[in-house]
């Protein structure tokens, strides 16, 4: 994808939005994908969530399943001074009420800040 972007007429307007769960579904190393996008100047936005490897899109709370890779991702983003958007693309359980959904979202942010 990054190589293709460089061939576009207005490549400066195009970046990537990597998502933890999508890379895990493919069995890829998310940190490598993020580092490549950062190095190319194309890391515009990032979706933080979690899931088991090689499964359907589960959208679990960030750091819920793979805490060590989540730690190294946060470390990378903070070390390089990433200033772009961090989106927690995670889904609370369908049986949760409004307050539980807010607690779930706070939990995603708390995990990021702890790491």
Give residue spans per PLM region:
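Histidine-acidic metal/acid-base catalytic patches
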Residues: 1-115
